[in-house]
């Protein structure tokens, strides 16, 4: 099922991203740059390993993981998190935990688009990606 997510995805719409970044503690200057950036997300499947690359003029990141296996990761905004990704009802659900906090990043395919919903406390951000040819 995760195979459906494979491909190169370009950000085309973003709602409430600045408020989300503020909620998780991202500083003002970083938020300003990140808000203007339109990243490309590349999802690759290699056996039971998923590789998630995010590329932008701001920063490039890469995470590789197996579903359900908790990893120690450093996020693009330098948070040290415990990170777990699962497949739930056709959605890739990514949970990050740090300092008693938790954020959830849910990726789902809707009408051929990749919808990323980020939630922290009561703040919800939606980012929409279209698949590149």
From Swiss-Prot:
The modification Phosphothreonine is found at residues 8, 30. The modification N-acetylalanine is found at residue 2. Octadecanoate binds at residues 127-129. GO terms for biological process: hibernation. (9Z)-octadecenoate binds at residues 127-129. One of its GO terms (cellular component) is cytoplasm. Keywords: Acetylation, Cytoplasm, Hibernation, Lipid-binding, Phosphoprotein, Transport. It is found in: Cytoplasm. Induction: Up-regulated during hibernation in brown adipose tissue and skeletal muscle compared with levels in euthermic bats. Its main location: cytoplasm. One of its GO terms (molecular function) is lipid binding. The keyword Oxidoreductase does not apply. The modification Phosphotyrosine is found at residue 20. The keyword Acetylation applies. The modification Phosphoserine is found at residues 23, 83. Hexadecanoate binds at residues 127-129. Forms a beta-barrel structure that accommodates the hydrophobic ligand in its interior. Belongs to the calycin superfamily. Fatty-acid binding protein (FABP) family. FABPs are thought to play a role in the intracellular transport of long-chain fatty acids and their acyl-CoA esters. FABPs are important elements related to the hibernating state in mammals. This is Fatty acid-binding protein, heart.
């Amino acid at each position: 099922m995760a195979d459906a997510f494979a491909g190169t995805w370009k950000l085309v719409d973003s709602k409430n991203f600045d408020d989300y970044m503020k909620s998780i503690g991202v500083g003002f200057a970083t938020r300003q740059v990140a808000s203007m950036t339109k990243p490309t997300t590349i999802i690759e499947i290699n056996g039971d390993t998923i590789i998630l690359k995010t590329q932008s003029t701001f920063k490039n990141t890469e995470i590789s993981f197996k579903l359900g296996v908790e990893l120690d990761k450093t996020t693009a905004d330098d948070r040290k998190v415990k990170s777990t990704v699962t497949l739930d009802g056709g959605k890739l659900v990514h949970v990050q935990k740090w300092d008693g906090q938790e954020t959830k990043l849910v990726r789902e395919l809707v009408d051929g688009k990749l919808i990323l919903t980020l939630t922290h406390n009561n703040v919800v951000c939606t980012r929409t990606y279209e698949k590149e040819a």
